[in-house]
Amino acid sequence: MFDIMGAIHEAICLILISIASWFFNLYYFIIGHVASSDVVGGSFHNVFGNETVWNIVSSVHQTVVIPIAESILALFMLVQLIKISQRIDATATLPAVKDIVFLAVSYVLFHWLIVNSLGLLDAVYGVFNEITNSDALTGASIQLGNMTLETSGLDLKKASIGGCFILVITAFFSAGTGLIAYIVSIAVATARAIQLYVMAAFSPIPLALLGFEETRQSGISFLKNFCAACLAGAIMMFLFAAYPLILTSMTASLGVGDLNQLVNADSSVNVTGVVDSALEYAFAPLLGLLMFIGLSILLIVGLVKAGSWAKEILGS
């Protein structure tokens, strides 16, 4: 005999599970493609997809910043000449040959650093970019984008409407958190790219400051901060690569990978080793599903702190 109530029950559960499946698949798609932009791992000339912004950086570097840096270098040479003349007046002797040679070598070295500063920073970025684009990171970061919520083996007769409804709510918030993670990742990666370009455009000035003992630490700090900004891209890619692995391992321990466990009112999901109460038993699937949201928030926090972590690694 045809069970009308059972058919209605299964139809409602199927609709709810289909909605939840769509949200979860959207979540997987968003997080899986969060690292696909060139802003994180693109070449220094094509961080924004083309060389338009790079041409602006190069133009500002050549026409505006280099003359300022050369003026600073000229001031450095003047200060050194004054020091040499003071020693001549104090000792009434000609300067040693080594002083003249040191002054000439210093000028040639710092002039070369100023003129070629853009190429030097490009090479430094390339070294860190090799880490960012290594197979160990880029290969793992796309795993989550190929994941989908499997519903083919679902037994609708054992599913509960309440469990399916909780699944929809959690899937909705998971997709929303994934959208936020994507927006934050794009914002952080773009801000990092702009920071790198600004530092590259004005790099001749801190490099020229290396000539003065009083300002030498400023030039060293600039180089360390630029390396930290480059390393931040590798840290972000590491987060993208580690995230799906952490998500898979932690949610698997709660049975989240089995959809029957999530919606079946008669299933047993072990959260703490032993389900101590009926309330904990009823909401155990919800605890596992909420882990999606918690781990996505963790990803957002990690992306925001990637720059500070890079500075801590380099001691800058």
Task: Locate predicted features.
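Alpha-helical membrane-interface segments at transmembrane helix boundaries
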Residues: 57-66, 98, 102-105, 191, ...
